[in-house]
């Protein structure tokens, strides 16, 4: 369950801070959010896929860590990101 290359490039372009930015917390959180959304849809049909569910929980935890880091370092960027992605916090 990975993102297609085209979708990944599109998400990176939407959230990057500069031209070659692929590793900023904003980009990483956006990619994880996209993957979490995709996996959540997968579980509507495949309710007993426990191995993928572990991957989902790992991705949610990683996103939480990145959001906590961003909140600690730059509160304005954090608030902008959660509003842009529509996350509850």
From Swiss-Prot:
InterPro entries: Ribosomal_uS15, Ribosomal_uS15_bac-type, uS15_NS1_RNA-bd_sf
SMART domains on file: Ribosomal_S15
GO biological process, any: translation
Example GO molecular function: structural constituent of ribosome
GO CC, alphabetical: cytosolic small ribosomal subunit
Family, as annotated: Belongs to the universal ribosomal protein uS15 family.
Protein name in UniProt: Small ribosomal subunit protein uS15
Organism: Nitrosococcus oceani (strain ATCC 19707 / BCRC 17464 / JCM 30415 / NCIMB 11848 / C-107)
